């Protein structure tokens, strides 16, 4: 035996000696690795292959014609599937052996036996390799096996060309490298695992650690006593390892790690939704098999969508999942439909993620989830704690902030508080991964990196291969079992998320609190990448909102009408909000699929809205049955029902929770309306008649289109018209004026001056600064192309687009300036940017309707406004509220937020004056001093090299205002720019004096937004969701202009639409208290 002094003097040499004894590359004939396999045979395995197929069932697959194939044959191209028929004849002399089948096709596969999905296979050579299936224990020799393997021609991480996140290589092929059976040397494999763990301790523990020195000593002693050519020494060495190292146990004060088996499955990323369905089957079947091997093993899985896909495509496997849920080994978690993006979905989308997720889990498995599970997303909205609590969950797990590239997040276990004061118990697994390999390094890191270990010495380890699926491997489970109570290593418990949080609960009072958003200091480009998807998502959210409101009205007031079930449409939209879909970080085929989904949802909504409008119109034409209109609200007047039908009307519906007055274009598709509306006081530049409509909140009006005159008609003249003039000087400037603002547009399209008249304030800084500067920046990053927008990109502006302007509409309803930007300003010289700058007679808002043909590479298009406003902070709309962020870079935490998320608006205000920058489909804002900007388009080249290429249409707006954002109705302007209103397609005749304004459900306070009106999921009532938008406690009453009030009672409920004994009940006119930014959900019980 080597003396201890020599070993200790040469610690690093000894560690490397251990490494070489375990190496699969060096000295394999002399080391332990070379003795892991006792027997192997490829001759015993016969393989035949089918033609390439797409998405066929096992029943159909076994009917295919198969031909012989062999090791070395390749299969492809990318994304295609093949089925293999495998027959095995076990050698007769392999008696009493445990036999393993080995398969490596360099891609993903699934073993099928007798119509049952048995186990997933993952080819290649990386740590995710899973090529082994235990065929039989205690073989009698001579057995015959026949089964099938379905392969998908893609790696665990897709088919990126020459790199993980590179665009797909459509012509990849995958080689069959192994198809054999083996008998493993059981003792050699067990010894190998013990030595590997000793090596990990020696490699990763601190240099002066006693356990490090002990591990190196014991491992070195084992190597000295092990004769690799005499397997009898293996058992002796195993006992030596146990006795000298692993038999030493922890004290009661040792920290504990709760090991949660997990499989992170990206529903799309470097593969499509369709391929994810296969990944689910491979992953889940494998973990169920391991549950049979290891009764102590528990596996947790989130995302109702993944379960739903498995139920639809692999029903037998799904039944086995349900069986394991009952036994407590397969643990549904998370509570949401998918693991969604944490920044970009609307508040209602967040609610629906939980609503449909929790309903699915309760229906399918008999219980709801008790924790929100979102390990991998790119930031976390400050409104999430309230949403989580509103959906009946109190605990939250994630870890992504460990990727921060500037500041280290200071907590592992803490209380996270949202903008309304709601809080959730939150844990960031200290191993800083959701794909832990359950090795010594990461187990110890779960303790050593626990930033709150002085307050709570419990931590979670999320272990298992993931992103592309897979889950825990047998070595992971066995390592955790061996290390369960080994001195120097945290105590380990096989656990579930719920069991873990039960251990945290007693420590709650000692934990620190983090208030506000969990901002992710990386992946800021995901606020902008894949602009078409982001626009589609915004439109779907808006149209579903309107569709639910209209159909709810129709169910109450249109005889025989039944609200359609919109849950399937919602679930499609929620799927597209997955955290690699909506952010823009997936491959091209994903966005082709998402575009189809969004288009389908929008078509369905349009059809339902059209039908609903027709139903309402039909009801109105029954003159004698027109519902009485209240005279007690400001938005309505008494109906008149004269029988003389001498005017043409259209029905207009407003899905905003406030009264709107808009200038509208009558589209060419409405030829019947245009035929009646022939005396328009203004025609648009593209030949469409313009008119003005005023509509009540959450309701509809009958609009007179054939009579000019008062505010009940579409064709009325403004008291203060909007005008535009071109200055008679060399500047070529254009001046637009209305009642509220005066704006000077330079000949190049930039804003030189913007005066808000009520405050007599200049908005644009008058030192040569400008507004509407369209700037192109170099947009490269450190690695994650589609994900990252770095601060240094803003240091390198390449060009400011130069335009030419002309007036194309000149009042009285609106003025429009057309700006054509020179394509020479585009680095590629290939493309176009055109704008129409629009000012309406009745608003201080200036709209910039923008059309871009974008063909750049690694460039960023953004718009900046240099304002004359001095504010230390700016406000940004988020879900159900807004948050404040600094406009300076005082600290590294401030500097890190150089690009932040805002939804429909951001507002920069000093006392009593400010300006909002609004948008209809963008999310990436930046504010520094008085400059406020919006990212419009990016052009990353991986993983989708077509990202954002082609045509785009979007609108951003500026809204100068006197007063605060609350008093100036910035929130309303954001909704107004985004939410549609709807006009019936066919005119109808009523008495010219008829005045019909109907508000379905609203409130008496501007601060309270009625965000959702829908049919309850159980069909027994209607659900109304409101939130307080100003950030202050108040009271409110519900209002309606429909009498008699069609509801007998209102019951407050949670976001799952559940009522319990403590639920408050109200009458329709009761006063209700609400806290700052609070979300409230009510069930309206109809008469």
UniProtKB/Swiss-Prot annotation:
Keywords for the protein's UniProt record, in alphabetical order: Glycosidase, Hydrolase, Metal-binding, Zinc
Record: residues binding Zn(2+): 264, 266, 376, 579
Enzyme class, broadest EC rank: hydrolase
Active site: 376
One GO molecular-function entry: carbohydrate binding
Pfam families: Alpha-mann_mid, Ams1-like_1st, Glyco_hydro38C2, Glyco_hydro_38C, Glyco_hydro_38N
Note on how the cofactor is bound: Binds 1 zinc ion per subunit.
Required cofactor(s): Zn(2+)
Database matches in InterPro entries: Ams1-like_N, Gal_mutarotase_sf_dom, GH38_C, Glyco_hydro/deAcase_b/a-brl, Glyco_hydro_38_C, Glyco_hydro_38_cen, Glyco_hydro_38_cen_sf, Glyco_hydro_38_N
Biological process, per Gene Ontology: mannose metabolic process; oligosaccharide catabolic process
PANTHER family: ALPHA-MANNOSIDASE 2C1 (PTHR46017:SF1)
Stated family: Belongs to the glycosyl hydrolase 38 family.
Protein name from the UniProt record: Alpha-mannosidase G
């Amino acid at each position: 035996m080597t003396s201890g002094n020599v070993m200790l003097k040469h610690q690093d040499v000894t560690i490397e000696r251990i490494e070489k004894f375990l190496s699969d590359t060096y000295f394999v004939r002399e080391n332990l690795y070379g003795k892991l396999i006792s027997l192997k045979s490829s001759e015993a395995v016969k393989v035949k292959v089918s033609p390439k197929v797409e998405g066929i069932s096992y029943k159909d697959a076994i009917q295919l014609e198969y031909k012989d194939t062999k090791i070395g044959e390749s299969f492809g191209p990318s994304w295609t599937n093949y089925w293999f028929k495998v027959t095995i004849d076990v050698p007769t002399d392999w008696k009493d052996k445990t036999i393993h089948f080995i398969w490596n096709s360099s891609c993903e596969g699934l073993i099928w036996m007798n119509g049952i999905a048995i186990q997933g296979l993952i080819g290649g050579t990386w740590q995710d390799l899973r090529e082994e299936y235990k065929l039989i224990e205690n073989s009698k020799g001579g057995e015959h096996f026949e089964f099938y393997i379905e392969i998908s021609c893609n790696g665990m991480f897709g088919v990126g060309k020459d790199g993980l996140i590179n665009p797909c290589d459509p012509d990849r092929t995958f080689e069959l490298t192994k198809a054999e059976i083996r008998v493993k040397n059981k003792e050699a494999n067990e010894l190998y695992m013990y030595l590997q763990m000793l090596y990990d301790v020696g490699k990763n523990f601190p240099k002066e650690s006693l356990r490090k020195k002990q591990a190196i000593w014991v491992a070195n002693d084992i190597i000295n006593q092990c004769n690799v050519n005499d397997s009898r020494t293996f058992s002796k060495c195993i006992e030596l390892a146990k006795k000298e190292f692993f038999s030493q146990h922890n004290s009661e004060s040792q920290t504990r790690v709760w090991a949660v088996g997990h499989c992170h499955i990206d529903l799309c990323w470097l593969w499509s939704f369709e391929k994810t369905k296969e990944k689910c089957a491979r992953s889940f079947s494998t973990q169920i098999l391991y549950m049979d091997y290891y009764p102590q093993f528990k596996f947790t899985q989130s995302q109702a969508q993944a379960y739903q896909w498995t139920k639809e495509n692999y029903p037998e496997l799904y039944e086995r999942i349900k069986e394991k849920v009952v036994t407590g080994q397969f643990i549904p978690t998370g509570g949401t439909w998918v693991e969604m993006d944490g920044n970009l979905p609307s508040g209602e989308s967040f609610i629906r993620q939980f609503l449909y997720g929790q309903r699915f889990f309760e229906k399918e498995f008999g219980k709801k989830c008790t924790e929100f599970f979102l390990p991998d997303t790119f930031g976390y909205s400050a409104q999430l704690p309230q949403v989580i609590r509103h959906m009946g969950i109190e605990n939250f797990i994630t870890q992504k902030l460990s990727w921060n590239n500037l500041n280290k997040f200071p907590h592992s276990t803490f209380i996270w508080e949202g903008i309304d004061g709601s809080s959730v118990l939150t844990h960031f697994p200290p191993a800083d991964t959701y794909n832990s390999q359950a090795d010594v390094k990461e187990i110890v890191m779960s303790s050593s990196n626990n930033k709150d270990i002085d307050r709570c010495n419990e931590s979670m380890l999320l272990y298992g291969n993931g992103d592309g699926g897979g889950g825990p491997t047998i070595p992971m489970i066995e390592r955790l079992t061996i290390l369960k109570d080994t001195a120097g290593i945290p105590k380990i418990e096989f656990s579930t998320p719920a069991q873990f949080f039960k251990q945290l609960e007693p420590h709650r009072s000692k934990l620190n609190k983090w208030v506000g958003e969990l901002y992710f200091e990386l992946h800021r480009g995901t606020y902008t990448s894949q602009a078409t998807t982001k626009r589609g998502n915004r439109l779907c959210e808006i149209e579903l909102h309107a569709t639910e409101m209209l159909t709810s009205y129709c169910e109450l007031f249109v005889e025989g009408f039944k609200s359609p079930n919109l849950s399937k449409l919602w679930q499609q939209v929620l799927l597209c909000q997955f955290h690699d879909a909506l952010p823009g970080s997936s491959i091209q085929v994903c966005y082709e699929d998402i575009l189809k989904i969004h288009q389908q949802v929008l078509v369905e909504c349009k059809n339902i809205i059209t039908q609903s409008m027709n139903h309402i119109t039909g009801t109105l034409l029954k003159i004698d049955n027109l519902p009485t209109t209240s005279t007690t609200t400001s938005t309505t007047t008494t109906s008149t029902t004269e029988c003389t039908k001498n005017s043409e009307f259209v029905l207009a519906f407003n899905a905003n929770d406030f009264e709107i007055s808009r200038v509208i274009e009558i589209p060419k598709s409405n030829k019947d309306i245009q035929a009646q509306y022939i005396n328009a006081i203004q025609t648009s530049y593209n030949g469409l008649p313009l008119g003005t409509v005023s509509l009540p909140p959450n309701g509809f009006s009958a609009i007179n289109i054939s009579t000019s005159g008062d505010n009940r008609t579409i064709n009325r003249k403004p008291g203060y018209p909007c005008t535009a003039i071109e200055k008679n000087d060399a500047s070529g400037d254009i001046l637009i004026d209305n009642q509220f603002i005066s704006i000077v547009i330079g000949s190049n399209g930039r804003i030189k001056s913007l005066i808000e008249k009520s405050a007599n304030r200049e908005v644009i800084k008058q030192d040569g600064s400008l507004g509407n500067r369209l700037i192109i920046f170099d947009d490269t990053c450190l690695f994650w192309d589609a994900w990252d927008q770095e601060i240094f990109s803003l240091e390198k502006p390449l060009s400011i687009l130069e335009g030419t302007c002309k007036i194309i509409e000149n009042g009285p309803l609106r003025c429009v300036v057309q700006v054509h930007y020179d394509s020479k300003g585009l680095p590629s010289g290939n493309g176009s940017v055109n704008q129409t700058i629009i000012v309406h007679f009745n608003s201080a808002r200036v709209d910039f309707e923008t059309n871009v043909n974008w063909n750049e590479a690694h460039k960023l298009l953004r718009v900046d406004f240099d304002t004359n406003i001095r504010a230390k902070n700016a406000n940004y709309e988020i879900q159900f509220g807004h948050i404040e962020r600094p406009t300076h870079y005082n600290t590294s935490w401030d500097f890190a937020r150089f690009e932040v998320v805002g939804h429909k608006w951001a507002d920069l205000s000093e006392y009593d004056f400010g300006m909002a920058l609004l948008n209809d489909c963008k999310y990436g804002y930046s504010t520094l001093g008085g400059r406020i900007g919006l990212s419009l388009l990016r052009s990353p080249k991986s993983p989708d090299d077509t990202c954002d290429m082609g045509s785009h249409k979007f609108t951003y707006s500026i809204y100068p205002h006197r007063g605060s954002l609350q008093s100036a109705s910035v929130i309303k302007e954001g909704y107004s720019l985004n939410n549609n209103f709807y006009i019936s397609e066919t005119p109808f005749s009523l008495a010219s004096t008829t005045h019909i304004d109907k508000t379905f459900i609203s409130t008496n306070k501007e601060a309270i937004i009625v965000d959702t009106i829908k049919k309850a999921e159980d069909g027994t009532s209607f659900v109304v969701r409101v939130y307080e938008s100003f950030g202050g406690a108040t009271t409110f009453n519900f209002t309606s202009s429909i009498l008699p009030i069609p509801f007998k009672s209102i019951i407050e409920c949670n976001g799952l639409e559940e009522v319990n004994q403590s639920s408050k009940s109200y009458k329709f006119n009761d006063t209700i208290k609400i806290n700052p930014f609070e979300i409230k959900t009510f069930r309206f019980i109809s008469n």
